[in-house]
Amino acid sequence: MARRGLLISFFAIFSVLLQSSTSLISSSSVFVNPSKVKQVSSKPRAFVYEGFLTELECDHMVSLAKASLKRSAVADNDSGESKFSEVRTSSGTFISKGKDPIVSGIEDKISTWTFLPKENGEDIQVLRYEHGQKYDAHFDYFHDKVNIVRGGHRMATILMYLSNVTKGGETVFPDAEIPSRRVLSENKEDLSDCAKRGIAVKPRKGDALLFFNLHPDAIPDPLSLHGGCPVIEGEKWSATKWIHVDSFDRIVTPSGNCTDMNESCERWAVLGECTKNPEYMVGTTELPGYCRRSCKAC
């Protein structure tokens, strides 16, 4: 299975990288140092890369975004359309992948760290949170049948912190499972009340938080529920990269056609995957699968 195989392969590779404290992974001129990565949660899977972005990269992204900030919106769970909501009170803008060499370099760095294709990612969204602004707990995978058509679910999310925040502004996972023998990496006194409601990551300029919205079998992970705590003192700048299961750049074909969306569908169907993994292969009326033709579902 392409989707399931991609996820499982990634986690296998990533676990090896986390065990290495000295090796560097490179792609062309892009280097990733596993020793700077620490796991902050296992359920959901979440990791922080300390110093992922340089000071220059952070300041450059903020500079690009300042001129085109607009109030942030959320996706309606039924229609999939964007709407304004008090759930999300930040302002933001999208930076195209090939905007300039610095942005392209960040895109390369993300792909090298995650082992995920650049074409699966959306453009980077830069956000500004001023005093009192926040993003209530939400999921990054989709509940509507519109957004999922292009690239499938958002498999992974990377939050890159572009500024330090004096107080507040943490990213919190309120439903994350907290190990009974957890060693606290943060002094609870340094966290806001919002952040104390679960496992939280304090925004530090240059750091990046990577977490997965799906389980390795491509099923949505409800423990990936997360939110951005209100900024109490200072200002918060961040950049979000959503990475989908499949290509986000690929042109979506018109609906109504009985086609397979993966060249391996016919082989998988012969191997019995239509019944073993019906969510991916067949799907539902609202969220059609990727191999409906080979599974004789249309």
UniProtKB/Swiss-Prot annotation:
**What is the membrane topology listed in the Swiss-Prot or TrEMBL record?**
Single-pass type II membrane protein
Q: Boundaries of each Fe2OG dioxygenase domain copy?
A: 120-245
| Annotated S-S bridges | 258-298, 265-291, 274-295
InterPro entries found in the cross-reference section: Oxoglu/Fe-dep_dioxygenase_dom (IPR005123), P4HA-like (IPR045054), Pro_4_hyd_alph (IPR006620), Pro_4_hyd_alph_FE2OG_OXY (IPR044862), ShKT_dom (IPR003582)
Could you cite one Gene Ontology molecular function of this protein?
L-ascorbic acid binding
Which residues are modified by glycosylation? 77, 164, 257, 262
Give the EC number. Answer: 1.14.11.2
Q: Which residue ranges run through the membrane?
A: 7-25
The record's subcellular locations are: Endoplasmic reticulum membrane
The catalytic activity, as recorded, is: L-prolyl-[collagen] + 2-oxoglutarate + O2 = trans-4-hydroxy-L-prolyl-[collagen] + succinate + CO2
- Known cofactor(s): Fe(2+); L-ascorbate
> Residue ranges of the ShKT domain?
258-298
Q: Which residues bind 2-oxoglutarate?
A: 236
Keyword Iron present in the record's keywords: the answer is yes
Residues the record lists as binding Fe cation: 138, 140, 226
Say which enzyme class the record assigns.
oxidoreductase
Q: Which UniProt keywords apply?
A: Dioxygenase, Disulfide bond, Endoplasmic reticulum, Glycoprotein, Iron, Membrane, Metal-binding, Oxidoreductase, Signal-anchor, Transmembrane, Transmembrane helix
Gene3D superfamilies assigned: q2cbj1_9rhob like domain
- Chief place of localization: endoplasmic reticulum
Please give the superkingdom of this protein's source. Eukaryota
Its family remark reads: Belongs to the P4HA family.
Q: What is this protein called?
A: Probable prolyl 4-hydroxylase 4
Source organism of this protein record? Arabidopsis thaliana
